[in-house]
Amino acid sequence: MEVFTKLKEGALLPEYKTSGSAGADLRALIEEPIILKPMQRCLIPTGLSVELPKGIELQVRPRSGLALKHGITVLNTPGTVDSDYRGELAVLLINLGNEDFKIENGDRIAQAVIAQAIQADFLQKDELSNTERGAGGYGSTGIA
């Protein structure tokens, strides 16, 4: 699938690191380093805009290594980029770790996953069909 991109000066295309990668790395495009303090959040620009085919979305997801090693994650994960959005992609990062985290220009800060997006027809109904689970949620199926 082709995804057309527009890059600001200095921005880099998303990059898959292996042939089996589902996520392509997104990089920060910043003039000066950003220090993300514990529990602080910041919107990090990428310098990237995309033109997605209708029926496709781009999901912005955390990088597992940043989450494990530093507590850095995408706050609104997965962030959804709709097919009709043409603005610059930015990544809302939060530091859930205990130490300051430094973000520099070109750092890989998140990953982009391309997915199908289906628009449903929502219809109102007085009663929904019964299931074994019913209305149980939030741990109702147990832990083990």
From Swiss-Prot:
List required co-factors. Answer: Mg(2+)
Q: Where is the signal peptide?
A: none
Pfam families, per the entry: dUTPase
Query: Which Gene Ontology biological process is one annotated for this entry?
Result: dUMP biosynthetic process
Q: Which Gene3D superfamilies match?
A: 2.70.40.10
Which amino acids does the record list as binding substrate? R63, S64, G65, N76, T80, V81, D82
Instruction: Provide a Gene Ontology MF annotation, just one.
Output: dUTP diphosphatase activity
Provide the alphabetized UniProt keywords: Hydrolase, Magnesium, Metal-binding, Nucleotide metabolism
Question: Where on the tree of life does the source sit, at the highest rank?
Answer: Bacteria
Does the keyword section mention Glycosyltransferase? no
Q: In which pathway does it act?
A: Pyrimidine metabolism; dUMP biosynthesis; dUMP from dCTP (dUTP route): step 2/2
Do the record's keywords include Magnesium?
yes
Write out the similarity annotation: Belongs to the dUTPase family.
- What is known about what this protein does? This enzyme is involved in nucleotide metabolism: it produces dUMP, the immediate precursor of thymidine nucleotides and it decreases the intracellular concentration of dUTP so that uracil cannot be incorporated into DNA.
Can you name this protein?
Deoxyuridine 5'-triphosphate nucleotidohydrolase
Organism of origin is Treponema denticola (strain ATCC 35405 / DSM 14222 / CIP 103919 / JCM 8153 / KCTC 15104)
**Encoded by which gene?**
dut
